[in-house]
């Protein structure tokens, strides 16, 4: 049994014995409205984890408390190499603590900033290498009827081995087979779909919009709807009207530019299915991979 299984199966200690005393907090690695995330060492097994501490009783809003508990339920259902893994949860010192897989190297936003600071674009081969892993993670989530609702570079973690881990499901929502849409304005404005801004109800296609925005940002090194002097109103109008600069045709492939434009469509029903996005990503990653035949033009059948 590996180290991860030891903690995941609660072999030692049992779940009702978990407490903050069993973790050595090393440093803070993230902060949210109601939470802080720390790099921590488990004392009973040689394993570093991300310990997310949520101030449960400071959340006077009942919905916020439910969202935190919902995050735990969602994570229990997910088991994929490209999704941050849930290990355990417990309440200690009036805090809800969630023990998560640690992604050491950082996140996609850090990688984008690195290239932007260096005045370089991310090579398309590299874009597909990471994007295909995100597409796999999203396909797994959607197959479980789970929507992420906050896909953005800062929530796409990258390990030291170059493995993508989609995380931060605090805004996730479980969709039963009878549920067709959700009505709550949450998420990051730059990546929010028109239907979410208009609060007209949305479904899994909103994740595809955000995924298209992320793919665009990997290529352009900035959000498609970014502006130097923008307020929330002007941002929302740009999103609703799908006003964004096209990616340069002389730098990026037709397939990449086409996938972006298909995901960033105002009408959710016209966006591709998650399976289609994954198919394109797999095809393009195979084309750009070292073992691929670089002399062959990539297919445009998608």
Curated annotation (Swiss-Prot):
It is found in: Cytoplasm. One of its GO terms (molecular function) is protein serine/threonine kinase activity. Expressed in hypodermal cells including in hyp7 syncytium but not in seam cells. May be expressed in vulva, uterus and some neurons. ATP binds at residues 29-37, 52. GO terms for biological process: gonad development; molting cycle; multicellular organism growth. Residues 23-288 form the Protein kinase domain. CDD domains: STKc_Nek6_7 (cd08224). SMART domains: S_TKc. The active site is at residue 150. GO terms for cellular component: apical plasma membrane; cytoplasm. Keywords: ATP-binding, Cytoplasm, Developmental protein, Kinase, Magnesium, Metal-binding, Nucleotide-binding, Serine/threonine-protein kinase, Transferase. Disruption phenotype: RNAi-mediated knockdown results in a failure to shed the cuticle in the middle part of the body at the end of the first molt. Its cofactor is Mg(2+). Pfam families: Pkinase (PF00069). It catalyses: L-seryl-[protein] + ATP = O-phospho-L-seryl-[protein] + ADP + H(+); L-threonyl-[protein] + ATP = O-phospho-L-threonyl-[protein] + ADP + H(+). Its EC number is 2.7.11.34. InterPro entries: Kinase-like_dom_sf (IPR011009), Prot_kinase_dom (IPR000719), Protein_kinase_ATP_BS (IPR017441), Ser/Thr_kinase_AS (IPR008271). Belongs to the protein kinase superfamily. NEK Ser/Thr protein kinase family. NIMA subfamily. Probable serine/threonine-protein kinase required for the completion of molting. This is Serine/threonine-protein kinase nekl-3. It comes from Caenorhabditis elegans. The gene is nekl-3.
């Amino acid at each position: 049994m590996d180290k991860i299984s030891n903690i995941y199966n609660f072999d030692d200690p049992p779940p009702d014995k978990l407490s903050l005393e069993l973790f050595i907090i090393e440093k803070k690695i993230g902060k949210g409205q109601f939470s802080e995330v720390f790099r921590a060492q488990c004392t009973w097994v040689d394993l570093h984890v991300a310990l997310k501490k949520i101030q449960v009783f400071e959340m006077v809003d009942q919905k916020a408390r439910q969202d935190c508990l919902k995050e735990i339920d969602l994570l229990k259902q997910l088991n994929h190499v490209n999704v941050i893994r849930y290990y355990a949860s417990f309440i200690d010192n009036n805090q809800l603590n969630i023990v998560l897989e640690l992604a050491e190297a950082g996140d996609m936003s850090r990688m984008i900033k690195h290239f932007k600071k260096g005045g370089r674009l991310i090579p398309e081969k590299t874009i597909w290498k990471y994007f295909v892993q995100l597409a796999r993670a999203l396909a797994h989530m959607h197959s479980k009827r789970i929507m992420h609702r906050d896909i953005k570079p800062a929530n796409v973690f990258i390990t030291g081995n170059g493995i993508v881990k989609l995380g931060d499901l605090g805004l996730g929502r479980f969709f039963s087979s009878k549920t067709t849409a959700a009505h709550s304005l949450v998420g990051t404005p730059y990546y929010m779909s028109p239907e979410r801004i208009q609060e007209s109800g949305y479904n899994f296609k909103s994740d595809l919009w955000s995924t298209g925005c992320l793919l665009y940002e990997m290529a352009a090194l900035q959000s498609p709807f970014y502006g130097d002097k923008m307020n929330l109103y002007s941002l929302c109008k740009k999103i609703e009207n799908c006003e964004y600069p096209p990616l340069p045709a002389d730098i990026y492939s037709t397939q990449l530019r086409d996938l972006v434009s298909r995901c960033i469509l105002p009408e959710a029903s016209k966006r591709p299915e998650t399976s289609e996005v994954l198919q394109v990503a797999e095809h393009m990653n195979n084309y750009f991979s070292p073992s691929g035949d670089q002399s062959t033009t990539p297919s445009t059948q998608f």
